[in-house]
Amino acid sequence: MVEQTAQPPAIRDREAAIQAGILIDVTPTALQLGITFPVTITRPLWEVGIVTNQALSEEDQTSRLRDILMAFRLRLAGLTTVSPLIDFPVLLALPPSHVPQPVPLFALIQADPTHQANVTLLLPNEVSLSITSLN
């Protein structure tokens, strides 16, 4: 007898991914920084880049989120042509270090029926998974 492993259903809808906790909607903060379209962050990026495994105050977490969003906004402003996948560096102190280091991140830009686009910010190791799931 072959044992079957239950696979979770593929989540292809942005709202369903937010409800499932796979994506974190950071659109309100993005709007404060002049980003005019919906923005989400993947759960792994949220856990590594925003909340970390150190005890950070809510103010520190908000500051880290704003740093990531501003780095994305500055990269976007410097582009003459926008592609569906954009790399951008951000300075973050990743535990256990307290010294900010350049961290490569990516933005996956997709068409959105109600906005021009929506963006998901993710870690480099999540890029191939995202591209595979789009195919």
Language-model segments: residues:
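Arg/Lys-rich, positively charged N-terminal/basic patches that mediate binding to nucleic acids
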Residues: 2-63
